[in-house]
Regions:
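C-terminal helical/coil "lid" or tail adjacent to the Rossmann-like core of SAM-dependent
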Residues: 155-211
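Class I SAM-dependent methyltransferase SAM/SAH-binding core
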Residues: 11-62
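A short acidic, Gly/Pro-enriched loop at the edge of an enzyme's catalytic core
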Residues: 64-72
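A structural alpha-helix within SAM-dependent methyltransferase catalytic domains
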Residues: 24-27, 90-94, 117, 121
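A short SAM/SAH-binding and catalytic strip from SAM-dependent methyltransferases
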Residues: 71-84
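A short glycine-rich, Lys/Arg-flanked "PGG" loop and its adjoining helix->strand segment in the class I
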Residues: 87-102
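Conserved alpha-helix/loop element of class I SAM-dependent methyltransferases that forms part
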Residues: 1-10
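Conserved catalytic/acceptor-binding region of the Class I
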Residues: 100-169, 185
């Protein structure tokens, strides 16, 4: 959020606003803010959390604005978009900005949660199944040219480690259940639990730290 350079009063879109907590912080910085999310459930929660802020339903790939934005901000969203749709999404984001507009985003990059995904891949294989890599975690070298192709000038990009603590014995299992849904679609619940248990047991020696993952 600190990377935004537009002055107070600028029209800023929070793309993939979720529960609206960051949308609210953008408004507190003096911006005229619009939150956009594809989940009606999240939008209802955002409207409850943020009085006086406007929200609209829209997918990152094809959302449209009545008024072009001075800046578009996005946090922890873009890695959820399929690889095949990434360029289309970036083209659309650029199109929704005024000339000289800013796009500031944070999302999972190359190597994100790789130990977990690699172990899930091995455990799926042990059961005769393929673990689909559904998240998009690019390198800067891959993504910067895509941004430029969309019409952006890349001024700053950084790939950095950011450990996310999962509290308690079941923290990692809960994280997998919450965020890694697609690979388990249609799977018997008992098999799903077995694979998750196998995964966390194999990761225990490297990721478990006394009372958290």
């Amino acid at each position: 959020m600190e990377l935004l350079t537009k002055p107070e009063g600028a029209f800023v879109v929070d793309l993939g606003c979720g529960n609206g907590m960051l949308t609210k912080k953008l408004a507190e910085k003096g911006y005229h803010v619009l939150g956009v999310d594809d989940s009606e459930t999240m939008l209802r929660l955002a409207e409850k959390n943020c009085s006086g802020i406007s929200f609209q339903k829209g997918n990152a790939v094809d959302f449209s604005l009545k008024q072009k934005a001075d800046a578009i901000f996005s946090n922890a969203v873009l890695h959820w978009i399929d690889a095949k749709d990434q360029q289309k999404m970036l083209d659309n984001i650029c199109h929704q900005l005024v000339l000289g507009g800013e796009f500031v985003c944070e999302f999972g990059g190359y190597g994100c949660a790789e130990q977990v995904h690699s172990m899930l891949e091995k455990c799926f294989a042990a059961h005769g199944m393929t673990y689909p890599r559904v998240f998009y975690f690019p390198t800067i070298g891959t993504y910067a040219p895509m941004l430029e192709q969309a019409g952006f000038r890349v001024e700053y990009a950084s790939l950095f480690d950011r450990p996310t603590v999962q509290e308690g014995r079941d923290g990692l299992a809960d994280w997998i259940s919450m965020f890694v849904k697609t690979p388990f679609l249609g799977m018997d619940d008992s098999l799903k639990k077995e694979i998750i248990w196998e995964t966390i047991e194999k990761l225990r020696d490297t990721l478990w730290q006394e009372d958290h993952w």
